């Protein structure tokens, strides 16, 4: 049977339809996607963001279940313990060196550590800070090794005893209290200072004690007066009043007079050096009475 010829219009439509089907141009969405992939930021986001999102979703699904979380944390803690609890990392005791018995006892109270313990669980910096806060401690070194927590102390050395309202304090050369004593006889080898503000002028006080060393045991104390100057207190109730400025030079002159004229060996109660231009000496009551009772004095008075 002979096929029926299509009309020219139908043949034209059929050709256009076949042409459209073979059109190599991309679709609208494909075109937009290709344009976006030409953008570096979008391309990097797709390349990096997609794996991150997939991993995040997987983690969320796994950790969203309590039994999965417990299983993972159990294995994690076991792995950590297998490393940190090894014998070479364990500390079983502590040792304190360089500290006096009283200071060592105070440090022991700060070492609140449940031994044995892993070095990974030790907060050495916190322990070092707490020990360094103790006033007698000048420097501290804390380190763990060989199964022992080693605490090495550099203790402040007292150079004087400060008599204050709350008792007798031991002071170092920087004016920092290192401890307290009950009686002066507990540290007789240390010089005695007293008065408000004496601890702030300890370097000057130690220099004055050095200059007064020729007087030996006659030196009893240095008393700070008005937080600005010193009085040197000697036995026999003698006092050397020093100026607020250049007290060292003033005391040197007094010591020179003692060596040349035995000034402090006489019946002198007070040597006033506060006025640099004029030295004033006040005699004892006994010396004044003896002076008044002299025959020449009585005759002159009559």
Swiss-Prot record:
The uppermost taxa in this organism's lineage are: Bacteria, Pseudomonadati, Pseudomonadota, Alphaproteobacteria, Rhodobacterales
The Gene Ontology CC terms held by the record are:
cell division site; plasma membrane
Q: What is its main location?
A: membrane
Q: Name one GO biological process term.
A: FtsZ-dependent cytokinesis
Entry's Pfam families? FtsQ_DivIB_C
Keywords (alphabetical) are: Cell cycle, Cell division, Cell inner membrane, Cell membrane, Membrane, Transmembrane, Transmembrane helix
Q: Which cysteines in this chain are paired by disulphide bridges?
A: none
Task: Identify its protein family.
Answer: Belongs to the FtsQ/DivIB family. FtsQ subfamily.
PANTHER family assigned: CELL DIVISION PROTEIN FTSQ
Q: What InterPro entries does the entry give? A: Cell_div_FtsQ/DivIB_C, FtsQ, FtsQ_C_sf, POTRA
Q: Which organism is it from?
A: Ketogulonicigenium vulgare (strain Y25)
Cytoplasmic-facing ranges? 1-43
Q: Which residues cross the membrane?
A: 44-64
| POTRA domain mapped to chain residues | 89-156
| Topological category with respect to the lipid bilayer | Single-pass type II membrane protein
Location(s) in or outside the cell: Cell inner membrane
Q: What does this protein do?
A: Essential cell division protein.
* Protein name, as recorded: Cell division protein FtsQ
Q: Is the keyword Transmembrane in the record?
A: yes
Periplasmic compartment ranges equal 65-302
Q: Which Gene3D superfamilies match?
A: Cell division protein FtsQ/DivIB
